[in-house]
From Swiss-Prot:
SUPFAM superfamilies: vWA-like. This is Uncharacterized protein MJ0077. It comes from Methanocaldococcus jannaschii (strain ATCC 43067 / DSM 2661 / JAL-1 / JCM 10045 / NBRC 100440) (Methanococcus jannaschii). One of its GO terms (cellular component) is cytosol. It comes from the Archaea.
């Protein structure tokens, strides 16, 4: 039994209808208080509760859920669903794996919530009513729930890959000037950190904006657009769709960080939607992207024709097979050569057709929809 007050009870009564009950309402309420309350005071300690509150992973989850009714609801539903499964298997006391899954799940969800629609100059949802509305959509939509989990996992992976690569700038030193940009500090200035007298002189020059800096001549690969053609034909329904959409959104985030426009082209047997993104997307846009699906046949030529209208490399994600006319193949080759652009194809559960191999600079076949294969894609594109 957990001690709770009138405020805790009021919060629970106000939001309990947002979740699916996998345990009894009373058991679910107790679990909610475990996650929601700032200080958990246990009146009657069972072996199960003792294992939960003393586990390091529970404390990590608490750092996310404490006094946040939305994250507490999400954690409660996930925990209760998994605990029910353990009970049915007679393994109720074996919660180590459950807490491990919960910690990973909450990290993925919070990463998805915070990665989009926030930050300076972008629309963010700090209004509790709006956040509760988004949480309710997440809890009632299993497809969206799975999508946000995969997206959060891939997002952290993509950002890590991006941060690793930007340590090695894609330019060259071409001139020296005076300035306070410590990132572009000339290597000869580093010796001044070792000697006290030289360090004092460096501080003086820093105050006067006079340390030696180098300018970077940016590589052309940082210019132009980044175009992603995403197949949403009937055969992409299910896990393929979730995996591919998560990849596409992660590539969007990295593209915008590089100050590239991100062009999204959704297609099946025709081009269904083209959107141009120049700033971070809102959470409503994420929900819309996660929900949209078309389900028709497959046509490669139409989306590729649209993609060539933009100025940048093209990523083509599909699980289908479709031939491209010889005339169009020649056009693509000419455009690639003239504009110095590349086409990357990601083929899910199918080998690329002859025509797709012909137009692609790199073709990757994905047989398993896992984090490992996602990393393979990020290695190629980030």
């Amino acid at each position: 039994m957990i001690r709770y007050d009138k405020y805790d009870k009021m919060v629970w009564e106000g939001c309990k209808n947002k979740i699916t009950f996998h345990l009894s309402e009373r058991e679910t309420e107790i679990v909610f208080y475990l996650f929601f309350k700032y200080e958990v005071e246990i009146l009657t300690e069972t072996d199960l509760i003792k294992k939960i509150v003393r586990d390091r992973r529970f404390k990590n989850v608490k750092s996310i859920t404490t006094l946040d009714e939305n994250y507490s609801l999400i954690a409660t539903e996930f925990f209760c669903e998994k605990l029910k499964e353990l009970k049915e298997k007679g393994r109720e006391e074996d919660i180590s794996e459950l807490l491990d899954e919960l910690e990973s799940y909450m990290e993925n969800i919070t990463s998805s919530f915070s990665s989009f629609g926030s930050g300076e100059g972008y629309k963010s949802y700090t209004d509790p009513k709006k956040k509760l509305e988004l949480t309710e959509k997440l809890l009632k939509n299993n497809k969206l729930k799975e999508f946000m989990k995969v997206l959060g996992k891939f997002k952290r992976m993509a950002i890590k890959k991006y941060k690793t690569k930007i340590k090695h700038f894609s330019g060259e030193k071409y001139s020296i000037n005076l300035g306070n940009n410590l990132i572009n500090l000339l290597s000869s200035e580093y010796k001044n950190f070792a000697e006290e007298i030289l360090f004092v002189d460096l501080l003086r020059r820093y105050n006067e904006n006079k340390p030696l800096n180098y300018k970077i001549l940016e590589n052309n690969e940082n210019c132009g657009d980044f175009v992603v053609c995403l197949d949403l034909s009937g055969s992409m329904r299910g896990n393929k769709e979730i995996w591919a959409k998560a990849i596409a959104l992660c590539l969007m985030d990295i593209s915008l960080k590089r100050n590239k426009r991100y062009i999204s082209i959704l297609f099946d047997d025709g081009v269904r939607d083209i959107k141009i993104y120049e700033k971070k997307v809102s959470f409503d846009e994420i929900l819309e992207f996660a929900s949209v699906f078309y389900g028709g046949g497959t046509n490669f030529e139409k989306p590729l024709r649209e993609a060539l209208k933009f100025n940048g490399d093209i990523v083509f994600i599909t699980d289908g097979e479709c031939e491209v006319s010889l005339e169009f193949l020649e056009k693509i080759k000419e455009e690639k050569q003239r504009r110095k652009i590349k086409i990357y194809s990601i083929c899910i559960n199918t080998k690329p057709t002859v025509s797709l191999r012909q137009i692609s600079d790199v073709s990757v076949t994905i047989y398993e929809l896992t984090s490992k294969t996602a990393e393979k894609v990020f290695d190629m594109l980030i």
